[in-house]
Amino acid sequence: GSLPFSDRAARKVFYTGENQRPDFDETHFAFSFDYSDDSRNYRLPLWMLHLNWFDVPHNEDRDQSYLHSLGDFLDKKIDIDKIRETKKEFCTFISSVAKGRRVDFVPKLHNRYKPIACAGGLFNNIRGKLNGRGDQRWKIEFLNLFKFNISFEHTRHSGYVTEKIIHPMFSNTIPIYWGSRRVEEDFNPKSFINGNKYPNDEELIDVIAKIDSDEDLYISMLNEPWFNNNEIPEHAKPENVMKFFKEKVLA
């Protein structure tokens, strides 16, 4: 919103799920994507909101975001036979926004290697779109069918890591990521394909093709924990978020 800012008024806290910077001339504190030395800012990337940290029961009447329990995310179990049985399709892409590197990359991978199932508004080729907003339960169920998902952000900033990388993880689908160059501080680089590392689309496509065609390499990547050392990043721990609230916002 746009409530008038005043140092004498109640504490104003900025939060965004978009790639925007907090303006501390307009707010007292911020939960943002930013890595910052400013003590008024806490890095709270959007992917954090898509884990069920407290085992809240699922509400079938809502297309809610927190569908996957933290316990299941950490206790990653790979059933190779089930993977072979269910993941018979190569790759999917789900987006309706024609913005960023993905606009060029998706057609290249589709035309130069293998067809991609596009289930959003952009490049749609499945004769329909996913139910709901296409970014929660229906999306995750759809992802179960695929080995890979193109998980490109629509824009890039050092800390801007959204739900795009974590949704395929919920389905044991390998993300093909592009966006934040610091994404490996949030997630284990051995568990996904980091498109930021490759200077051009051709090299990235070669890497994808290699993993897709080598089952041992593919399974090895699937067996990696999603988090580095299978440990929750410090900034993502609920107790540290609450500590910021208590010691900064509520002080």
Model-based region annotation:
Residues G1-R8, V13, F24-C118, L122-H154, ...:
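Pol beta-like nucleotidyltransferase catalytic core
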